[in-house]
């Protein structure tokens, strides 16, 4: 398979859900930023796990338990390699990006933030990367600061340097905005944070599915992402953390394999990574995530990037031919595969409902980013997003549906 391309028609055949019709129209699924679809290869490994070696992991000595343990720990190694983490202990399986960020806020944050310290975020963050830091700041009487954004929703180096200072203890930032498609230079931001003695926690929910990641190059202290946005199952996420930081952090959930020894009045914890994986682990989900990673790697990130870039630029241009349609965020050549927009005088929920009648699935609402909506001066928006199984035909179907929506709402009854 060519490094810079893949056969999208063959890819589409791997996704059974895309074969169906919605409202008697072909399904154009343009909501992968919320949740991606799942290829048959992932469905098959999940089916195989439950049919052939469903068992708990680590402590069982029987054959099924050993097979399940191998599958689970091999998945951890797959993730480690996928993001080029240095040690397997740095890969913690969680319920998702939100759970991962909350572990950092509660475990690292509570132990390292004091009164008067500063936590730096941006207004483009998902609620899951604002609220945990808000609550930490309240608990510790610390200050939450925001890096200013340009009119296009991007960050300027001078503003980053002006906001992060010696009082900063944590910088929490999205690698890619789930609303604007802004791609932040987290490597540079990490360098600036470290120069001031701060750590950086990166929300990678929208980057891990779409771009090659190298933790040793980025030098992030913590990095979080979810399986369901990258062709994997729901209910599985990853927290990457530098080993030396995780070793000094206390667990936030207790029970199961994270226990080393329990007496009547005290307990000690297992070593990494198990220390942060209380209860029965997400075994099937981790195995499914590993298969999703294999699928992505087989396509290749260069090819994925080129495919999404062409689709996004095409959609951007076609959508702007519609009078009264406004697109938010960076120019077409500086954004990820997401286009957030509004049609003048039509509520985004009406837009999403109307295009759904034409088989087009888009998201409408504040996208868990109410501070950003306020910054944009709107209450909500519609959002289309693109992934490996999308085509120009999907874009054309969206544009035609938007034109019909505009015409319908312009009609005087």
Curated annotation (Swiss-Prot):
<protein>
    <recommendedName>
        <fullName>Probable cysteine desulfurase</fullName>
        <ecNumber>2.8.1.7</ecNumber>
    </recommendedName>
</protein>
<dbReference type="InterPro" id="IPR015422">
    <property type="entry name" value="PyrdxlP-dep_Trfase_small"/>
</dbReference>
<dbReference type="GO" id="GO:0030170">
    <property type="term" value="F:pyridoxal phosphate binding"/>
</dbReference>
<dbReference type="InterPro" id="IPR015424">
    <property type="entry name" value="PyrdxlP-dep_Trfase"/>
</dbReference>
<dbReference type="GO" id="GO:0006534">
    <property type="term" value="P:cysteine metabolic process"/>
</dbReference>
<comment type="similarity">
    <text>Belongs to the class-V pyridoxal-phosphate-dependent aminotransferase family. Csd subfamily.</text>
</comment>
<feature type="active site" description="Cysteine persulfide intermediate">
    <location>
        <position position="368"/>
    </location>
</feature>
<dbReference type="GO" id="GO:0031071">
    <property type="term" value="F:cysteine desulfurase activity"/>
</dbReference>
<dbReference type="Pfam" id="PF00266">
    <property type="entry name" value="Aminotran_5"/>
</dbReference>
<keyword id="KW-0663">Pyridoxal phosphate</keyword>
<comment type="function">
    <text>Catalyzes the removal of elemental sulfur and selenium atoms from L-cysteine, L-cystine, L-selenocysteine, and L-selenocystine to produce L-alanine.</text>
</comment>
<dbReference type="InterPro" id="IPR000192">
    <property type="entry name" value="Aminotrans_V_dom"/>
</dbReference>
<dbReference type="InterPro" id="IPR010970">
    <property type="entry name" value="Cys_dSase_SufS"/>
</dbReference>
<dbReference type="InterPro" id="IPR015421">
    <property type="entry name" value="PyrdxlP-dep_Trfase_major"/>
</dbReference>
<feature type="modified residue" description="N6-(pyridoxal phosphate)lysine">
    <location>
        <position position="229"/>
    </location>
</feature>
<dbReference type="InterPro" id="IPR016454">
    <property type="entry name" value="Cysteine_dSase"/>
</dbReference>
<keyword id="KW-0808">Transferase</keyword>
């Amino acid at each position: 398979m060519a490094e810079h391309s893949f056969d999208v028609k063959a890819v589409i055949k791997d996704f059974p859900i895309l074969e169906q019709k919605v409202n008697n129209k072909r399904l154009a699924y343009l909501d992968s930023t919320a949740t991606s679809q799942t290829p048959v290869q992932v469905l098959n490994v999940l089916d195989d796990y439950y049919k052939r070696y469903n068992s708990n992991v680590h402590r069982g000595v029987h054959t099924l338990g050993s097979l399940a343990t191998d599958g689970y720990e091999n998945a951890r190694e797959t993730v480690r390699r996928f993001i080029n983490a240095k040690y397997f202990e740095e890969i913690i399986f969680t319920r998702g990006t939100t759970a991962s960020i909350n572990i950092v806020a509660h475990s690292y944050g509570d132990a390292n933030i004091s009164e008067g310290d500063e936590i730096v975020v941006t207004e483009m963050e998902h609620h899951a990367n604002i609220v945990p830091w808000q609550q930490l700041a309240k608990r510790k009487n610390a200050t939450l600061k925001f890096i200013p954004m340009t009119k296009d929703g991007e960050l300027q180096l001078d503003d980053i340097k002006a906001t992060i200072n010696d009082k900063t203890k944590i910088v929490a930032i999205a690698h890619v905005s789930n609303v604007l498609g802004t791609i932040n230079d987290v490597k540079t931001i990490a360098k600036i944070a470290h120069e001031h003695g701060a750590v950086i926690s990166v929300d990678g929910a929208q980057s891990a599915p779409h771009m090659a990641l190298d933790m040793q190059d980025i030098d992030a202290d913590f990095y979080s992402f979810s399986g369901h946005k990258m062709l994997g199952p729901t209910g599985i996420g990853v927290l990457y953390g530098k080993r030396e930081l995780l070793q000094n952090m206390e667990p936030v959930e207790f029970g199961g394999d994270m226990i080393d020894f329990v007496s009547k009045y005290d307990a000690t914890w297992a070593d990494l990574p198990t220390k942060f994986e209380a209860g029965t682990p997400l075994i099937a989900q981790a195995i499914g995530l590993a298969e999703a990673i294999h699928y992505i790697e087989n396509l290749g990130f260069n090819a994925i990037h080129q495919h999404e870039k062409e689709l996004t630029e095409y959609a951007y241009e076609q959508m702007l031919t519609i009078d009264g349609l406004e697109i938010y965020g960076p120019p077409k050549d500086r954004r990820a595969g997401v286009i957030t927009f509004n049609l003048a005088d039509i509520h985004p929920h009406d837009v999403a409902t109307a295009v759904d009648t034409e088989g087009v699935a888009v998201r409408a609402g504040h996208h868990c980013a109410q501070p950003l909506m306020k910054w944009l001066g709107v209450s909500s928006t519609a959002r289309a997003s693109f992934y490996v199984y999308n085509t120009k035909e999907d874009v054309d179907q969206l544009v035609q549906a938007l034109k019909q929506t505009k015409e319908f709402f312009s009609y005087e009854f």
